Amino acid sequence: MKNLTILFKVTTLSLAVALLVGCNDDDDNDTAPPAQRSNQTVNILAFNDFHGNLEPPKRYVEAPNPNDAAQSVRIPVGGVSYFADAIKKLKAENPNNAVVSAGDLISASPLTSSLFLDEPTIEVMNDIQIDFDAVGNHEFDRGTDELRRLKNGGCQQYTSTVPCQINKNFSGAKFDFLAANVAMKNDTSKTIFPAYKVKTYGGI
């Protein structure tokens, strides 16, 4: 995966769902109502390769100076505070949304997160209220048992680092972990996490 966090919005113009009406032998039901349609606009807010970057990295982007178009200014980028604010603003534009991490949310992370087994990143993402994390390769850096602990919570130690150093009641991720292509070694018919989840919008 590219070492770049990307935040983008995909707008689905129309989600149409047909209401299927069952049939039986009762003559009173011969005139069933026609299939109904309902349109919903859904924003998918997706990002990837966050890697526990809670603090802004020492990087800048050049942007036009609002006071002088001929000049530019250096603006610090990244960090979870900016990220959370961006998500909040995008959510406010449309309540029908899904916030999706497309992999490498954790691990290969800076000390502020990795020192605590990336528990701070999980808890911050809980506060931001992301919906799904499609686990990437780096989620498995510390093994499947530790990855499940981050999802389900608890303080069982699976690595050389002691867990729950900050929060003695670490409860795990409140969002779904997804993994369609990672099967269990002892039962290849089962994936380590669900392959998909369904989210409803406006009753659809």
Swiss-Prot record:
<dbReference type="InterPro" id="IPR006179">
    <property type="entry name" value="5_nucleotidase/apyrase"/>
</dbReference>
<dbReference type="Pfam" id="PF00149">
    <property type="entry name" value="Metallophos"/>
</dbReference>
<dbReference type="GO" id="GO:0008253">
    <property type="term" value="F:5'-nucleotidase activity"/>
</dbReference>
<dbReference type="InterPro" id="IPR029052">
    <property type="entry name" value="Metallo-depent_PP-like"/>
</dbReference>
<dbReference type="GO" id="GO:0009166">
    <property type="term" value="P:nucleotide catabolic process"/>
</dbReference>
<protein>
    <recommendedName>
        <fullName>Uncharacterized protein in pqq-V 5'region</fullName>
    </recommendedName>
</protein>
<dbReference type="InterPro" id="IPR004843">
    <property type="entry name" value="Calcineurin-like_PHP_ApaH"/>
</dbReference>
<dbReference type="GO" id="GO:0008768">
    <property type="term" value="F:UDP-sugar diphosphatase activity"/>
</dbReference>
<dbReference type="GO" id="GO:0030288">
    <property type="term" value="C:outer membrane-bounded periplasmic space"/>
</dbReference>
